[in-house]
Structure formats: C-alpha cells, structure tokens
Curated annotation (Swiss-Prot):
This protein's encoding gene: GATA15
Organism: Oryza sativa subsp. japonica (Rice)
Reported phenotype of the disruption mutant: Reduced plant size. Delayed transition from vegetative to reproductive growth. Reduced panicle size with overgrown bracts at their bases.
Zinc finger (GATA-type): 154-179
UniProt protein name: GATA transcription factor 15
Gene3D superfamilies: Erythroid Transcription Factor GATA-1, subunit A
Organism superkingdom: Eukaryota
Gene Ontology process terms (BP): floral organ development; regulation of DNA-templated transcription; regulation of timing of transition from vegetative to reproductive phase
Length: 279
C-alpha cells in the first residue's frame, strides 16, 4: 500500500512505500499492472485458486461479462498445447470444485486419439481424397490406378532405380541398364560361337564345292572332315608322289614364293625368277 505524507513547510507531497515483506511488495506491484476481475491479488492464496491457473501448456482468455468489471482476465502463458488440450481446460478447471476443493490434475487426451496417423493421411491423399480411410497400400494402388513403374524391379539384381530399363529373357523392360548391357553381350557372344560351330560343320560342303573345278578332284572320294581334305591341285590324290598342277598359282594362293628351278651351290637363299609371282 502507498501512504501519502504532507510536509507543511515544503508544500509538496511525498509518496513512500510502506515497510513490508518482499513477497507482499511484489504481489502488490503485480496486482497494480494486472488486476483480476474479482479484486484479488495475483498469487492465489488458496490451493483451489492456484490449481485453476496451474496450466503451463495452454492459453486462457476469459471475456468480461456485463456483471464483471470492464477489464478481462488474460493469462499470457506460452502456448505449447494442441486445440484438443485447450478444449479440455474448462473440464480440468471445474474438477476441484466437484471434488470438495481437492486439486485434480488435468487429463489430456492421448496422442493417438488427438492426432491423425501420417501414413493414413498420405494414403488417403494419394488415393484421391476418397472420403474413407485407406486400409493399405495395396488397396490404394488398386483403387487409384497405381503406376507399375514404382514397383518394377530388375529380374537379375533386384534393383528398383535405374536410368533405363532394358529388355531381357523375362520380357520387355525386365532388366536394369547394367544387367541389360551384360545380357546383350552374352547374347552376341553366344551367337558368334554358334556361327563358328556351323562353319566348322560345313567344311565338307566347302571341299565339295572346290572339287567341282577339277576333273581329278571329281574322281577323288568325297571327304567330310577338314583334317583329311584332299587338295584339288594334286594329280592322283593326296597320297604323295603326284604331279603338282599349276604350282605357280598354288604358291600365289598360299602366299608362298616358289623356289628357283635351278639353284646354284653358292646361293644361300633361293633366287626369285622375277619380281612378280607370275613368270
């Protein structure tokens, strides 16, 4: 409380704070700036009144009624609660009066009941806001036309991320980029091996085609293997001792330089008859 003292000689007033405890002074000062509607001081004197304001996670705003004073009671505490917890505050404030003055802690609803599951929200969003909760990703994909590319995996390595899908043994776009390249290489290698095997098997047919150009080769027996092929340029079969027909042409065909007919004793290398293969 503030007392006014008058000094007759000076002619002015002096306001001196009455001596009291620090707690009373703090409560009086706070009550001056934040008056309550019922005229009481801010720190409640009873347990019931303190329980009514013991809420540090909500904001309470009480509008002034016509019967009360013109100033309203506003609690400017930091709001850390949810709208559901704010709605539960009047129930928690009225609980002490119903229990004969005993303070009852405020019971807030559980988090699972107050909030919505993010998975359910996401599924309902991707399902096109259908109004009914989604029961699973499979039903969501079936109902909203889920893209099959999101569930596609490589048939070889099982990866789901690749810059390009390639054709494979299980159908189009069944392999990832790396596995598709390896599969193509193996396929080409197998095709080349098959072609080589077919050429080796047809060696007897090639020999028969060559034999058509020589009369002596027609009389020779047909040979089916490459190792026993009879040369069509040897007269009398390939048994040895036969006369070689067209030896110059045979040497040119085999890329071999024929030796000179008459070699001298002083020559180390065989002499060429001319610069050309044909004499």
């Amino acid at each position: 409380m503030l007392h006014h003292y008058y000094s007759g000689g000076a002619g002015h007033h002096q306001d001196v704070a009455a001596a009291g405890s620090p707690g009373d002074m703090a409560s009086s000062t706070f009550s001056l700036f934040f008056p309550m509607s019922n005229g009481q001081c801010w720190p409640p004197s009873t347990v019931e009144e303190s329980a009514a304001y013991d809420d540090h996670s909500t904001v309470t705003t009480s509008p002034s009624s016509p019967s009360s004073s013109s100033t309203g009671s506003v609690d400017c505490t930091l709001s850390l609660g949810t709208p559901s917890s704010r709605r539960a505050e009047p129930v928690a404030a009225a609980a002490p009066a119903a229990n004969h003055g005993a303070p009852v802690p405020a019971h807030y609803p559980s988090l699972s009941a107050a909030t919505v599951s993010w998975d359910a929200t996401a599924e309902s969003y991707y399902c096109g806001q259908q109004g009914r909760p989604a029961t699973g990703a499979a039903k969501c994909a079936a109902g909203a036309g889920h893209d099959a590319l999101l569930d596609r995996r490589c048939a070889n390595c099982g990866t789901a991320s690749t810059p390009l899908w390639r054709n494979g043994p299980r159908g189009p776009k069944s392999l990832c980029n790396a596995c598709g390249i390896r599969y193509k290489k193996e396929e080409r290698r197998a095709a080349a091996t098959t072609t080589t095997a077919d050429g080796a098997a047809g060696c007897g047919f090639i020999t028969a085609q060559r034999g058509r150009g020589s009369t002596a080769a027609k009389a020779a027996p047909a040979v089916t293997t490459c190792g026993e092929e009879t040369s069509p340029y040897v007269v009398g079969g390939g048994g040895g001792g036969g006369e070689v027909a067209d030896a110059a042409y045979l040497a040119w065909r085999l890329n071999v330089v024929p030796p000179a007919a008459t070699a001298t004793a002083f020559s180390v290398w065989p002499e060429r008859a001319s610069l050309y293969h044909y004499n």
